[in-house]
């Protein structure tokens, strides 16, 4: 069935940098399949803007982490959400696409769906890991879910939610065999000798909580492995500034801080010490041994612990269905423990070979041409809507 010939309008919301990456991938796929006149608007980041996206609000207004930490931003977030819903109901786009940010987007998606506007959500929340009761909210809010991981559609099907497994765009982007030598040349690092990438996060609260511990662990590792070098990507000038007091407190470290280029930094490494998050999947796709860690404020940690179901939080372990890399969380994330675990990952060649096999299988499973699959699923929803009109 052909799509409408009049101008299509698709409203989209991405609430944080990882969502901006996914949404930009989807936009590229849609622009290859929908008329050039299609108007894409809503809330997005720099990657979406590069695709001509019309962002009516700044994405960073929605970027929060943790229960307690979000309290101060709630009034502003509620104001933006209210304005967005009023705009959607007045303009009635052909579909609303929420990209991740479920606590924000599900409310908007339900309002859109109740008004007869198809609602699509890109990235199934981790209901299989914690807060499984959210599946009821999904069933009320979402017409179609675009899933990054292969086991998610079966879970959604039980709740009557239509879905499509589209794979993960990082698996399409990252080559199956990383070029470690080329990455070291790009960063001006020696071709020989051990390199450890350290990624403590990108938010002020993350740096404050885990930054000192990571730097203390690096100091211990350098004592125990004298030839080791460290590389740490700083996504923004503001993040580099946040790191400066920690750098100044450890002048002995053989540390290179890069301006962004986190993927290049991880590619150059022999092992990685990383804060839990999407970046751990990126590290797995780069076939790197790693140690996963995080620290959150005590109350946030207690809430998360009580609502969790899986024994692991890192995506490599979740996808493998078992611990394939170590996780050191909260009070277990001491400098000594992090240093010991990271050096073990660095030195254990047999474990490195095993991880390469596990991560290669994972990579192939997730490599689905996500931009095309996700865009095709959206087009099908639009065609179904036209068929009902």
UniProtKB/Swiss-Prot annotation:
GO BP annotations, alphabetical order: lipid A biosynthetic process
Q: Which is a Pfam family this sequence falls into?
A: LpxB
Q: Which reaction equations make up its catalytic activity?
A: a lipid X + a UDP-2-N,3-O-bis[(3R)-3-hydroxyacyl]-alpha-D-glucosamine = a lipid A disaccharide + UDP + H(+)
Tell me what gene encodes this: lpxB
Q: What is its EC number?
A: 2.4.1.182
Q: Which organism is it from?
A: Burkholderia vietnamiensis (strain G4 / LMG 22486) (Burkholderia cepacia (strain R1808))
Under the GO molecular function aspect, what terms does this record hold? Answer: lipid-A-disaccharide synthase activity; phospholipid binding
Q: Name one GO cellular component term.
A: membrane
The pathway that the record names for this protein is: Bacterial outer membrane biogenesis; LPS lipid A biosynthesis
What job does this protein perform? Condensation of UDP-2,3-diacylglucosamine and 2,3-diacylglucosamine-1-phosphate to form lipid A disaccharide, a precursor of lipid A, a phosphorylated glycolipid that anchors the lipopolysaccharide to the outer membrane of the cell.
The answer, when asked if Signal is one of the entry's keywords, is no
Q: What is this protein called?
A: Lipid-A-disaccharide synthase
Q: Which family does it belong to?
A: Belongs to the LpxB family.
This protein's UniProt keywords: Glycosyltransferase, Lipid A biosynthesis, Lipid biosynthesis, Lipid metabolism, Transferase
SUPFAM superfamilies in alphabetical order: UDP-Glycosyltransferase/glycogen phosphorylase (SSF53756)
